[in-house]
Amino acid sequence: MNQENSIVTRSDLCRRIESLPQVNIGHYPTPLEPCPRLSEALGGPKIYIKREDCSGVAFGGNKIRQLTFTIGEAMYQGADTIVHGATAQSNHCRQAAAVAAQLGLKCYLRLSRDHKSFVQGNLLLGHLTGANVELVDAPFGPELDVVK
């Protein structure tokens, strides 16, 4: 049987994940919080919310899980700078800038300007973490698809 068709066990998967370069930046595991009123309103299924906002870096969020590996790989390869681009209020860029500051990396953020690009929220936090922030008129993400 070739490797593409082989079954990967949980222990195999854990071993493979653990072998990847990563940085310890999150506070895990994040808690599960019961939602009894929502459960009752929906007729009984027990509903829980995973509290990724408790992951610890720059007000938390699920992006920290990805950055654990992408920045881990970058550092493994000797990078001293990270570059991210998205919209001005990007959660991912906010967290990337905070992680870079925490780890002593330089950070450049290239963010698309919009009519609401006041220096507040995630854009302000990018500045406060010491990232080099450049606002550009070029679109990113779904906005870019519209331009195409």
Model-derived regions, located:
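PLP-dependent amino-acid enzyme catalytic core
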Residues: 1-148
